[in-house]
């Protein structure tokens, strides 16, 4: 029988050691960049903190990391970097692609900075990660191949440095001659356009008049892979409807963008068990955010007329948002919090539940989304905090809803999934 986390915690408590003290007991005064800190930085930070990417500085070399050491320590201890803001004390705690640092990794960085940021023996430095140029797709490694289809907006669009917010609608033909199921997708502004693309939402227009939502890109978001057994149908002859929000570049330069959508398909002839749906839920367009108020709560609700299995949730707020929670209200009035996450407008993060804990929600339930806002001087993004703010499309307006990824279950499928979940818990309790 393996040593569980719970058992390990009990043992540590009995002998009077914490994971942090074990760290220092094993490595007294020896934590250095080459052996201990560089692997953490390379694995978790340099995807963004490298030349030509979106971060303000590169962290590929010792000298730069040492210079920024106190700031890095502050950010990782606050868990504002790497950006992954799920509340570790509330709700579901198992996620795919969790980019947050472990407590031990944070302790290692803090101890290194506090000890003077020693370099160590550079012979032990791991090779620095190699990256393709800015037009590469981040999903190529995960999918094992380039995209099957790339669809750009029809023409480049230039955003003037002194211009207002722009909400543009574009139409792109896909050129598809047969129906296909989408496994994964990635939306990518052009390299020059990154600073001015706030969001890019695509919807499908089928030749027969149907269609629906396809994808959403926003600041800090990269790509989506549909869970196993699911996919999104795109039909032959589909036209894409783009809704792109541009804002003037903060560097005072004119910027030209040509955003593109990359699609990876399931193998021809392979149909998924379920069609994945991405939809925003519990919208609250009656926002009332008075100036000077530091903690403002809003609530939104969504009734479910079908059984669903939730695979991911992604909060959506604007500059004044600070936190969002999602809970289920069952027909018998029981309430269950699924997840809470802090909010940073620069990072639109989809939190993908691990398959074994994806919430199973019976029809007749209500999704309840609670959001909090700060319209006071303590919020650096508040602008003039004397001003009232309400719902709207501009970044200086605000919003409150959750993007929910899910698929529908028949009554039999729901009952079977619940039975499997209960059986799994019983097996786990015997370990």
Briefly describe each language-model feature range.
Residues 8-9, 29, 64, 73, ...:
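Generic detector of ordered secondary-structure context
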Residues 11-12, 32, 140, 283:
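Residue-level detector of alpha-helical transmembrane segments in integral membrane proteins
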Residues 23-172, 190-191, 198, 237-243:
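Aromatic- and Gly/Pro-enriched helix-to-coil junctions and flexible linker segments
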Residues 5, 87, 91, 215-216, ...:
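Short alpha-helical "patches" and their helix-cap loops
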Residues 136-412, 422-431:
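His-enriched metal-coordination microenvironments in redox/metal-binding proteins
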Residues 1-11:
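Bacterial N-terminal signal peptides that target proteins for export
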Residues 9-21:
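Bacterial N-terminal signal peptides
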